Amino acid sequence: MAQASPPRPERVLGASSPEARPAQEALLLPTGVFQVAEKMEKRTCALCPKDVEYNVLYFAQSENIAAHENCLLYSSGLVECEDQDPLNPDRSFDVESVKKEIQRGRKLKCKFCHKRGATVGCDLKNCNKNYHFFCAKKDDAVPQSDGVRGIYKLLCQQHAQFPIIAQSAKFSGVKRKRGRKKPLSGNHVQPPETMKCNTFIRQVKEEHGRHTDATVKVPFLKKCKEAGLLNYLLEEILDKVHSIPEKLMDETTSESDYEEIGSALFDCRLFEDTFVNFQAAIEKKIHASQQRWQQLKEEIELLQDLKQTLCSFQENRDLMSSSTSISSLSY
């Protein structure tokens, strides 16, 4: 329930007025102590069934804002406030935080409908898929929640298929919706399996200056295989590759991002065959474009010839009409 904000100074009455005393007392208190953030109020759709997830809305009358409960819970940049009343089962979202999340969503496009306002992101650190909550469900993304611990998160369809990722997302408590802010910078708590894999990677980096040959890389891959993390490692690599097109198409991509992507693609021997095939594709497209240009050139010549012929017909008709007029006048 929204609480009244303190009376403003210009509305304070005379000093002797009983209405003025609460206002004066309020003004004497520090602003941070007295002011309470306005909360979203719970509403239930009277025409929806009671057991459906979309019948619960939260509404802020002062800002004319309404949002589904799940859209609020699963939004990546939004958390609930400290609950002032533990007996109140309603969610505790303050209006200003919701407005900031709406503003953040204006920069994010939904992977499913391609419209802005997509504040629900895949929980995997390197995945940049964003959705509207109900679009995510249509795209077979998997919401995961623990109401007791206040954890609400979502995995896209691709990453929900892999047990290690799904397990780590299910039990890591990084996206709490009650009691603490959630980082947007990607500081995820890592499960033991991921930490083990990262330790291997760090060891490879430390050894890179001294051993750049297969004596380090081969054992690393074998250890990943023994630990059951080889698929996870490859999925991380694929996630990085899958994120490249979206980054390149984004108008806000920085020059350093272009340099990083270019280095990853052109300096990696893994893609040598890919570039050979890509060169062949370029030659094929050049040939197709040349053929199309030749066809267009022939079509243009035909149209110009047709235009000239039509002009000749028009000139002949005008001459005939003029001759007929002169003949009629001579009589």
From Swiss-Prot:
Chain ranges of zinc fingers (PHD-type) = 108-160
Q: What is its main location?
A: nucleus
Q: Sorted alphabetically, which PROSITE patterns does this protein's record hold? A: EPHD (PS51805)
Is Signal tagged as a keyword? no
Q: How does it assemble?
A: Interacts with BRCA1 and RELA.
List the expressing tissues: Highly expressed in T and B-cells, as well as natural killer and mature dendritic cells. Expressed at higher levels in Th1 as compared to Th2 cells. Expressed at low levels in all normal tissues tested, including lung, testis, small intestine, breast, liver and placenta.
GO cellular component terms, alphabetically, are: nuclear membrane; nucleoplasm; nucleus
**C2HC pre-PHD-type zinc finger positions in the chain?**
42-78
Q: Keyword Hydrolase: yes or no? A: no
The identity of this protein, by name, is PHD finger protein 11
Q: What does this protein do?
A: Positive regulator of Th1-type cytokine gene expression.
Give the Pfam families listed for this entry: zf-HC5HC2H (PF13771)
Question: Which GO terms of the molecular function aspect are on file?
Answer: zinc ion binding
